Amino acid sequence: MPQVTMRQMLEAGVHFGHQTRYWNPKMAPYIFGARGKIHIINLEKTVPLFNDAMNFLSSVAQKRGTVLFLGTKRSARESIKEEAERCNMPFMTQRWLGGTLTNFRTVKQSVARLKELEAAETDGTFDKLVKHEVLGLRREREKLDASLGGIKEMNRLPDAIFVIDIGHEDIAIKEAKKLGIPVIAVVDTNYDPALVDYAIPGNDDAIRAVQLYARAAADAVLEGKAAAPNSASVREEEFSAESADEGKGRRAPAKKGDKKADAAE
């Protein structure tokens, strides 16, 4: 598991919270104190929680699960997109569309439309249309790509969501909670850590801090993927199990009227 040290967190400014007047009392256990009316986050509490969260992400990836990277605030967009692409996971960096999770069937229809327009632009279909029609279709494609481009290969609901700012992404978190999707999130001093499954107390504004979180999350996913059994070994195990079952059937055929044997088969 890739480790992030306390020194790295200090250098990235993870320990700087929000102004003391904006604090959420439920963050009190993770606050070291205040400096110049700014809360200081206790990194001795953050590090183990951070490692727990990264271990969970790794375990999701090891089971071939999907992690949706989410960061639509300006300071998070670039890092979230870059790191999600590096570990080949879906992402959203523009405005969260209400119903992305809870109305996923409709979202998939919009994604299908995006793919249709992308294909039409490359297969020569656009060349057969008049200029104003092409412009209209390109605008539609650009709009869909901006909002859904990062999830166009996400064919089912994600197994977990990695979030940078829970206040900024509150609608997404509510949708995930409704569907029972685990949320791993950076929680600053002005929010309630109980709103998510894996809270990482830390600065959710500083670009360097966001880069650190996103890079570590991508590393955790990549490590989990590397530890996942490959398809060949999975098939070999299935074949061995099938052979064993067949052998058992030949050696000990069930007797008529033997309900236990019938159930075992």
UniProtKB/Swiss-Prot annotation:
GO terms for molecular function: structural constituent of ribosome. One of its GO terms (cellular component) is cytosolic small ribosomal subunit. InterPro entries: Ribosomal_uS2, Ribosomal_uS2_bac/mit/plastid, Ribosomal_uS2_CS, Ribosomal_uS2_flav_dom_sf. GO terms for biological process: translation. The keyword Ribosomal protein applies. It comes from the Bacteria. SUPFAM superfamilies: Ribosomal protein S2 (SSF52313). Residues 245-265 have a biased composition (Basic and acidic residues). Gene3D superfamilies: Glucose-6-phosphate isomerase like protein, domain 1, Helix hairpin bin. Keywords: Ribonucleoprotein, Ribosomal protein. It holds the Pfam family Ribosomal_S2. Residues 226-265 are annotated as: Disordered. PANTHER family: 30S RIBOSOMAL PROTEIN S2 PROKARYOTIC AND ORGANELLAR, SMALL RIBOSOMAL SUBUNIT PROTEIN US2M. Belongs to the universal ribosomal protein uS2 family. This is Small ribosomal subunit protein uS2.
